[in-house]
């Protein structure tokens, strides 16, 4: 019998965990609840359109504005919206009194054109508080029931002072948000914004990702943010709250029905084997083109092991860097051949690392019915990254797990272990994997000889998952192409290299076919002889 090499064993654990029955997962969400009710607000956007903002970037700002407006309760007695456009001068595009419906506002935003001169941010804020929010322009008398809000969007250093005018606005009860883009002067943002500043200052590295802030402002304007707590939902068993919205789910042993609200008890056989699997792939600059090709091969090696069909496994693919791009949704392709071709054709984005935005996209888009997800199917996400995220991941990672998604985190090179753990489902040790070198990815499960399966006499490796894997042939030497890092270790004699596998904590003895494989997690030293290998933290050997 041939023992599993480190990379093959890593894939073994990953694949076996992927396809546990959905009934064992507990939560299985599908239904999105009501939109939030927003507090009556006089809201003025103050938008920088100086020459540093290119026309295509200004279009991105307009998309962001529209997304925020979409979430509001617009009306004379609800939220009123005005917009101030500025550069060297200030132009009021429309006052608070101009539009009483959401449709009118969205149309007005689409018509706005950039001014393309200097950057007089202080002058624009002064105009907003003295003119745009005035009674004559549609502003309502000050009241505890009506909020006064100004959102400033800028990408540069102002040519005038913002400190004093912003202080006067805050003292007058106006809530100021500051959004900075690119090479903006961050001290200026702090001078503008209200306290607490971590809630009122936002920065994005380019206009291409400004849209990701829209959800924050949608939530900020929600009057009712926990519909589960107020009972304003129709979930039969479990209500999972998000600001102004909710998702229905089921307790362990139940699956969600197609209505997205009610639950059915699972069959004794373990429930449906249907799985909706979405890859979230890091396409940041640090990956490099040659390594990105190895990642694509890794994806296709996993696809090779799946039963792809309308009733069994569906696959979706999302790439992220500074922005998030859906390569293809669940259900678009119905054969392995088509999926693998689409993966091979995926182009490399090569920018930043916004893992948090990618996780939010997975929650809000990838696993929705409109994107091909199936009621009752197990939801599995595999996040692949090579570095620290440039945005926050904690909230989105927690929400994905709260919604019952089974989340795996695969890290390479400079990937941060704490972030991998934050993403991974419980038990964490079974759901995150780390390798030191992209070259290893090409070896993981390469041309697997047997499809991993569970047979009548499963091998009880209880610390990871009960499984049996059939492999044929003799134990081969673990050469450089099989190892996960090239860290030399002390010692004389045979060539020794280091393998780090983060698959779990101390595996129990496991019978594989007619051989006995004893593994313990840790640094595994691969000896050139190939008939057995020792470890610094345990032993790994084969016995006939």
From Swiss-Prot:
GO terms for cellular component: collagen-containing extracellular matrix; extracellular region; matrilin complex. The keyword Isomerase does not apply. Expressed in trachea from fetus into adulthood (at protein level). GO terms for biological process: extracellular matrix organization; growth plate cartilage chondrocyte morphogenesis; regulation of bone mineralization. It is found in: Secreted, Extracellular space, Extracellular matrix. Keywords: Disulfide bond, EGF-like domain, Extracellular matrix, Glycoprotein, Repeat, Secreted, Signal. N-glycosylated; reduces binding affinity for type 2 collagens. Disulfide bonds join 228-239, 235-248, 250-263. Residues 42-217, 276-448 form the VWFA domain. GO terms for molecular function: calcium ion binding. SMART domains: EGF, EGF_CA, Matrilin_ccoil, VWA. The keyword Amino-acid biosynthesis does not apply. Residues 224-264 form the EGF-like domain. It comes from the Eukaryota. InterPro entries: ECM_Assembly_Org, EGF-like_Ca-bd_dom, EGF-like_dom, Matrilin_cc_sf, Matrilin_coiled-coil_trimer, VWF_A, vWFA_dom_sf. Glycans are attached at residues 77, 345. Residues 1-26 form the signal peptide. It holds the Pfam family Matrilin_ccoil. A major component of the extracellular matrix of non-articular cartilage. Binds to type 2 collagens and forms long concatenated protein networks as part of the extracellular matrix. Required for the network-like organization and bundling of collagen fibrils surrounding chondrocytes in the zones of maturation and hypertrophy. Required for mechanotransduction and adaption to mechanical loading in cartilage chondrocytes, resulting in an increase in expression of the extracellular matrix components ACAN and COL2A1. Acts as a moderator of angiogenesis in response to injury. Homotrimer. Part of a complex composed of MATN1 (via VWFA1 domain), type 2 collagens and type 6 collagens. Forms a complex (via covalent bonds) with ACAN; the interaction increases in abundance with increasing age of the organism via an increase in occupancy of MATN1 binding sites. Interacts with COMP. This is Matrilin-1. It comes from Bos taurus (Bovine). The lineage of its organism: Eukaryota, Metazoa, Chordata, Craniata, Vertebrata. The gene is MATN1.
């Amino acid at each position: 019998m041939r023992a599993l090499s480190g990379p093959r064993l890593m894939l073994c654990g990953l694949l076996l965990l992927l396809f546990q029955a959905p009934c064992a997962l507990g939560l299985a969400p599908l239904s999105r609840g009501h939109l939030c009710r927003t507090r009556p607000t006089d809201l003025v956007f103050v938008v920088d359109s100086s020459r540093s903002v290119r026309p295509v970037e200004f279009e991105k700002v307009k998309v962001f504005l529209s997304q925020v407006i979409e979430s509001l309760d617009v009306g004379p007695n609800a939220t009123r919206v005005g917009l101030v456009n500025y550069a060297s001068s200030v132009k009021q595009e429309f006052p608070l009194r101009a539009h009483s419906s959401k449709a009118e506002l969205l149309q007005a935003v689409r018509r706005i054109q950039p001014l393309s001169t200097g950057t007089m941010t202080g002058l624009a804020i002064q105009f907003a508080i003295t003119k745009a929010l005035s009674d004559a322009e549609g502003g309502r008398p000050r009241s505890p029931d009506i909020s006064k809000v100004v959102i400033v969007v800028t990408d540069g250093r102002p040519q005038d002072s913002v400190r004093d005018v912003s202080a006067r606005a805050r003292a007058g009860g106006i809530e100021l948000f500051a959004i900075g883009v690119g090479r903006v002067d961050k001290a200026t943002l702090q001078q503008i914004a209200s306290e607490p500043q971590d809630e009122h200052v936002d920065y994005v590295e380019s206009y291409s990702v400004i849209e990701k802030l829209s959800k924050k402002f949608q939530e900020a304007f929600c009057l009712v943010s926990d519909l589960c707590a107020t009972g304003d939902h129709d979930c039969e068993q479990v209500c999972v709250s998000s600001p102004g919205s909710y998702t229905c789910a089921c307790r362990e042993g139940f699956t969600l029905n197609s209505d997205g609200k009610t639950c059915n008890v699972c069959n004794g056989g373990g429930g449906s084997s249907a799985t909706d699997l979405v890859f979230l792939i890091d396409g940041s600059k640090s990956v490099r083109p040659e390594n990105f090709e190895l990642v694509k091969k890794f994806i296709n090696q996993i696809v090779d092991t799946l039963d792809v069909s309308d009733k069994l496994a569906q696959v979706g693919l999302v790439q992220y860097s500074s922005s998030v791009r859906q390569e293809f949704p669940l259900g678009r392709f119905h054969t392995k051949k088509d999926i693998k071709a689409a993966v091979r054709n995926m182009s490399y984005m090569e920018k930043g690392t916004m893992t948090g935005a990618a996780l939010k996209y997975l929650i809000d888009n990838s696993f929705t019915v409109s994107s091909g997800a199936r009621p009752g199917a197990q939801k599995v996400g595999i996040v692949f990254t090579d570095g620290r995220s440039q945005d926050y991941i904690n909230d989105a990672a927690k929400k994905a797990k709260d919604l019952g998604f089974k989340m795996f985190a695969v890290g390479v090179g400079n990937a941060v272990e704490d972030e991998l753990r934050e993403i991974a489902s419980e038990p964490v040790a079974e759901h995150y994997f780390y390798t030191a070198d992209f070259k290893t990815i090409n070896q993981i499960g390469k041309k697997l000889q047997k499809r991993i399966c569970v047979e009548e006499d499963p091998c009880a490796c209880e610390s990871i998952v009960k499984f049996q894997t059939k492999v044929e042939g003799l134990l081969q030497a673990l050469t450089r192409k099989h190892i996960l890092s090239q860290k030399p270790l002390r010692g004389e004699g045979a060539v020794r290299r280091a393998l780090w596998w983060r698959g779990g904590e101390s595996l129990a003895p496991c019978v594989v076919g007619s051989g006995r494989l004893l593994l313990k997690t840790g640094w595994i030293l691969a000896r050139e002889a190939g008939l057995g290998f020792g470890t610094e933290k345990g032993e790994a050997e084969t016995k006939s």
